[in-house]
Amino acid sequence: MNETVFTNARLITPDAVVEGTLVVRDGRIVSLDNGASSLAERIDLEGDYLMPGLVELHTDNLEKHFIPRPKVLWPQGVPAFFAHDAQIVASGITTVFDALSVGEYHDKGRIAMLGKAVGALNSCRSTGKLRSEHLLHLRCEVADPRMQDLFFPLSDTPALSLVSLMDHTPGQRQWRDTSSYRTYYSNIA
């Protein structure tokens, strides 16, 4: 049994901020009490705030670390992934669904990045050194004829927890017409 006691904390609950003590046992909150704890084995937060971690269900932040500028693919996946993890945990996010695009319309480098990003995710998770829990969200672009061929090799990835179907076809809610689509992509190069 692993137990951690946080005391003298401002605990953020769904209804209020209370001053008190929080006990975590085996990774789960087991009690929240008003007042300080007198236990010898405790962490005194000296009035600092303590809140549950946030869950991010969809972020494109990982792609920004692999493609920091248009047409630039970061050469090493693991350092890019750890940089992403540092930003995520610094934001208070303890569980993140890293969204990766499976398919694209314009060569923005996402296809080249896809396998590298999933490989880095698997490598980093296996080290046990990630500070947030990273799960995989594959966004399958239905209008890309390569989508199925890209998706199936990734479908048995242990971290895969969410799959969504996306339709960014011009005129289908993403752009009001083909002219808007052309304007958007003319600014990428």
Sequence positions of predicted segments:
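N-terminal metal-binding scaffold of metallo-dependent hydrolase/deaminase domains
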Residues: 1-38
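Short, acidic, Ser/Thr-enriched surface-loop or helix-capping motifs
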Residues: 6, 24, 44-45, 56
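Active-site metal-binding motif and surrounding structural segment of the metallo-beta-lactamase
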Residues: 36-51
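Metal-associated gating/positioning segment near the N- to mid-region
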Residues: 48-116
